[in-house]
A protein has these predicted regions:
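A polyanion-binding, active-site-adjacent surface
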Residues: 2-156, 160-168, 172-175, 179-184, ...
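Rhodanese-like catalytic fold shared by cysteine-dependent sulfurtransferases
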Residues: 186-190
Length: 214
C-alpha cells in the first residue's frame, strides 16, 4: 500500500493484526483475496484520489477477487466476468459510448484516480458477506472518512453503500441500485454514473476521470 495511508491505518494497527492473524490461523477456512491484495486499493496515493466507488465485499469466487472493488484479474476471459461487472460494463457503454472492454480488470480507472474500495476487505470462498462484522467496516470507514473534507464525489451502488457515504458525511453522492442482476433493472441501468461523476468534477474545476478501458 502507498505510504500516504499509513497515518489513517495507524490507529487500527492492532485491530488489523488481530484480523489477519485470525484469518491465517483458521486453517479450515480459506479467505479471499490473497493476503498481499487485501489493501491493494490503497496502492493509489491518497492525494491522487479523485472519486470513490464503494463496494460491498470481495467476489467470493476463487480467482476473481483481487483487492479492487468490482475488478477481476485481466486473465479472466471477458465472457466469464461476474454478472455485476457485466452490468457495469453495459452501463459504461451506454453512458459513455465506449466499446466493450477486453478484460474485467479496472486498473485503468485506478490510474485515473478512482479508489475502488470494498467496505469489507475479505470473504470466505462461496460465502458472500461471510466476514461482515469482523471489523473491516470500522477500518474502511476511517479510510473513507479521511477523504470527506476534500468533497470528492462518490459512486454508491446499493443502499448499504449509499447509507455509508451519507453517514460519513460525503455530499457529492451518485447513488443508484446495485448492478447485480437482482437490482440492475430497478434503476442502475440508465443511471449514468460515470458521466455524472465527471460533471461534478468539472463543476468543482477538477480534472475529469478518464473512464476509457481497453
Amino acid at each position: 500500500m502507498n505510504s500516504s495511508w499509513r497515518s489513517v491505518l495507524e490507529p487500527h494497527a492492532d485491530q488489523i493484526s488481530v484480523l489477519l492473524n485470525e484469518l491465517e490461523g483458521d486453517l479450515s477456512n480459506q479467505y479471499l483475496p490473497l493476503r498481499e491484495h487485501i489493501f491493494r486499493a490503497l496502492n493509489l496515493p491518497r492525494d491522487k484520489v479523485k472519486t470513490i466507488i464503494i463496494g460491498q465485499d470481495p467476489y467470493p469466487t476463487l480467482g476473481m477477487a483481487e483487492g479492487l472493488a468490482f475488478s477481476v484479474p485481466g486473465t479472466i476471459a471477458i465472457g466469464k466476468i461476474p454478472p455485476s461487472l457485466r452490468n457495469i460494463f453495459t452501463e459504461y457503454r451506454s453512458d459513455l459510448g465506449c466499446g466493450q472492454p477486453t478484460t474485467g480488470h479496472l486498473g485503468g480507472w485506478v490510474e485515473s484516480g478512482v479508489l475502488l474500495l470494498n467496505r469489507i476487505l475479505t470473504v470466505s470462498p462461496g460465502k458472500p458477506l461471510s466476514h461482515k462484522g469482523k471489523g473491516w467496516e470500522e477500518i474502511t470507514d476511517s479510510i473513507l472518512r479521511s477523504l470527506v473534507e476534500r468533497d470528492l464525489p462518490v459512486i454508491a451502488w446499493g443502499k448499504p453503500a449509499e447509507n455509508a457515504a451519507l453517514r460519513l458525511g460525503f455530499r457529492q453522492i451518485v447513488a443508484s441500485p446495485h448492478p447485480s442482476p437482482l437490482s440492475a433493472y430497478r434503476g442502475f441501468f440508465g443511471s449514468q454514473p460515470f458521466s455524472r461523476i465527471n460533471q461534478i468534477l468539472l463543476s468543482q474545476q477538477r480534472e475529469p476521470i478518464d473512464w476509457h478501458l481497453t
